[in-house]
Every structure is written in C-alpha cells, then in structure tokens.
Amino acid sequence: MSWLLFLAHRVALAALPCRRGSRGFGMFYAVRRGRKTGVFLTWNECRAQVDRFPAARFKKFATEDEAWAFVRKSASPEVSEGHENQHGQESEAKASKRLREPLDGDGHESAEPYAKHMKPSVEPAPPVSRDTFSYMGDFVVVYTDGCCSSNGRRRPRAGIGVYWGPGHPLNVGIRLPGRQTNQRAEIHAACKAIEQAKTQNINKLVLYTDSMFTINGITNWVQGWKKNGWKTSAGKEVINKEDFVALERLTQGMDIQWMHVPGHSGFIGNEEADRLAREGAKQSED
C-alpha cells in the first residue's frame, strides 16, 4: 500500500507544471522594489506590492529562474522592465464614483480670467530612461499636488508640485503663475505632469491627486459645463473655466487614470508632491 501511495504521489508531481521552467497557465511576477520583494504567481499579488509604492520595480517573466534573477538584479536585459503587458490584468480604474457638481462650482475662489497669465511649456525636456519611472500595469505613475498659503486672503502664494519618484529628473516644484489659489494650483499641477509625460512620449498615465475637485471636474463636470455654455447647474459662470479648458486640451490623446489619494495621510508620493508644491510657492513670480 505504501508503494502505491508513493507511486501516486510521483505521478501527481509529474502532472504539475514545472515552476522553474515555463508555466503553462501563467507567468512569474518579480518585484525588485516594493512593499515585499520576491516572485509572485499572479498580477494581483504583484500589484499589491507595487501599487502606490514610489519607484517600484517589477517585471513579468516566463520562467521562475529569470524572475529570481531579476529580483537579485541580474535579469536578462531583453525583458522590458516595470510594466505588465497587454495580456496582464488592467491597472486601477478611474475614480469609481463621480460626485455631484457643487451648486456654486467653486466657492473658494473669485472669478477672474486666467489664460493670459499661464504660459505653456515650450522647452523640450531631455529624454528620460523608462526604467526611472514607476508603473501600474503599463501606465506610468505620477503624483501631483498644489498648495496656496493665505488662500482667499491677502498676499496668497501658490505652488505646484509633480513627483515621479525618488530623485527623478522630472520632479518639479514651481510657483503658480497668475491668480494665486489652491484649486488653480491643483489643476495646473496635473497640467504640468501631463505636459511632462508628453515630452517623454508617455501616453498612459496614472495620475494621483488629493483634489477631488480636479478629478470630478475633468472626468465629469466639464462635459456638463460645456453643454450648458460653461455655466454651473445653478446658472453661474464656471470660475475655473480657463483652467479646465487647458487641462482638457492636454488630456487629448492621453489615456489617464485619475486616482484620488487622501492628502497628508502618509502616502509617500503625495507627501513628496506636497513638499515640492510648498517649495514652489516660496519662489518669486516671473
């Protein structure tokens, strides 16, 4: 009887796919930098380690040996780094719930045209290695934030921050031109990130922001405002019309996943974007 059990066990093992070779039913997901490092068998397990983790590094491999080699920093250079291919699970969806439009559009700012103050970026940015970006699936991850001291009071100072990862050459904190308000800063931080992405030929972007006003404005309210002649449901002029016009124009040709992250809640990317924005607010206006 013991011999039969041994034989049955050997047969069962032979029927299993070899984990050190090519798996017939999936791939191996290697995480070099994330919450936990190692090799995982599903994209969901991998994503749990790299989602919202700054400068995460991960790859998908056909064999376990290659996956572990990557974890040990000796992976084959032929495999592209940092993203899931078209057969993998899709990255996070856009904000699942769209809030209702506020009755007054934006109650914290006074209406004033802004377009004349804002200058589009015209300086071409040097190409940056794709390995320096963080990825969620095949989407590049970026964090944006805006700030304004004395918002709505005398002598406000606003800045925008864009954070791509630790020490990334595209990280930027600059003073917001024109009308100094917090919500304008939030919108134009997103504008800056998209401008930068386009200079790097990046057309898939996961953009994290703590501004639900920006997210709901660009994903939902803008269409209603346009149909209503850029007026709110209460019949008032949309205060940030020119800002959202600029943002919507930049999103053309881009696949952007708008993601909300709670502000000042310990998310490193958000904290760094906030730091950059505050540094930008200290700069003088050009």
From Swiss-Prot:
Ubiquitous. Mg(2+) 1 binds at D145, E186, D210. Mg(2+) 2 binds at D145, D274. It is found in: Cytoplasm. Its EC number is 3.1.26.4. Residues 136-282 form the RNase H type-1 domain. GO terms for molecular function: magnesium ion binding; nucleic acid binding; RNA binding; RNA nuclease activity; RNA-DNA hybrid ribonuclease activity. Residues 101-115 have a biased composition (Basic and acidic residues). Keywords: Cytoplasm, Disease variant, Endonuclease, Hydrolase, Magnesium, Metal-binding, Nuclease, Primary mitochondrial disease, Progressive external ophthalmoplegia. This is Ribonuclease H1. It comes from Homo sapiens.
